[in-house]
């Protein structure tokens, strides 16, 4: 079997160690804790952070490696999934081989090692998409719920691993931008992020269609709160891109001017909520349950079937294989928020992105 062959690349002792660490308890971290702890990146704090990651990251990586070996319907045997599983095993091996962190020299070496781990895992999402696509061809849709639940757990865990590594690495930046603590912006303007994401999405729309609907943004431009701008940009880009495409395709042959996309930013006591509204014709009610799945996209997969699995630069993109909405919802949920879609077939769609303003939600730990 392919799984057995792949495992033979790694010593039996490593596989046993993976199972041992995969049974250990994970420790969740809140946005507020990351912000407060990282606000003083002293040598001592960086040492404490590295010591925590030295114990925590192998647990999280081991859990995913075990799950990648035991997927249903033969998904574990797909070449793309085997490649991802090998990345996780290699990263686990590197982390476990790293000695106890005792001083700042150890901490700096550890930071370089986990930076390399993060780079190794850059293409996990498109590679897993390729594996699922290889599996999907021979399955009926009734068997895909279990795969979907696995992918939710897997990608949520990946967001957490990359956040922990990225936050620690970024704390070493000798010249951090104003009001930033690692990846976190303590005074992030959701209006500004929404504007930047909208401009990026419109440029893609112009490239594909030659024109793009207007986007109007409403809210208090002076309002700020602590959040991770890269996460919000990713979510807003996906929502706006979907709305632009829907409106553009609905009005492409119409004499009417395409109506604008409307973005409203509301700052509540518990949540910051961003609504993205379009008049792109909406989604049929029968199709709504499928918009958050990874498995029913009608768009063309940008990854070619004959991709060389030895090459590390598979194109990193979410466009084309239907991962934008489910991944965006996971990013929202990672820090205690959510994403809801309400559609009116024949008119348009409203997307509600809820972001926890309190910042004290523990990471969800799948």
Curated annotation (Swiss-Prot):
Changing residue 241 to A: Reduced activity. Keywords: ATP-binding, Kinase, Mitochondrion, Nucleotide-binding, Phosphoprotein, Pyruvate, Transferase. ATP binds at residues 238-245, 278, 297-298, 320-325. The modification Phosphohistidine is found at residue 121. GO terms for molecular function: ATP binding; histidine phosphotransfer kinase activity; protein homodimerization activity; pyruvate dehydrogenase (acetyl-transferring) kinase activity. Residues 122-359 form the Histidine kinase domain. GO terms for cellular component: cytosol; mitochondrion. Transmembrane segments: none annotated. Treatment with the His-directed reagents diethyl pyrocarbonate (DEPC) and dichloro-(2,2*:6*,2(-terpyridine))-platinum(II) dihydrate inhibits kinase activity, including autophosphorylation. It is found in: Mitochondrion. Pfam families: BCDHK_Adom3, HATPase_c. Belongs to the PDK/BCKDK protein kinase family. Serine protein kinase that inhibits the mitochondrial pyruvate dehydrogenase (PDH) complex (mtPDC) by phosphorylation of the E1 alpha subunit on Ser residues, thus contributing to the regulation of glucose metabolism. This is [Pyruvate dehydrogenase (acetyl-transferring)] kinase, mitochondrial. It comes from Arabidopsis thaliana. The gene is PDK.
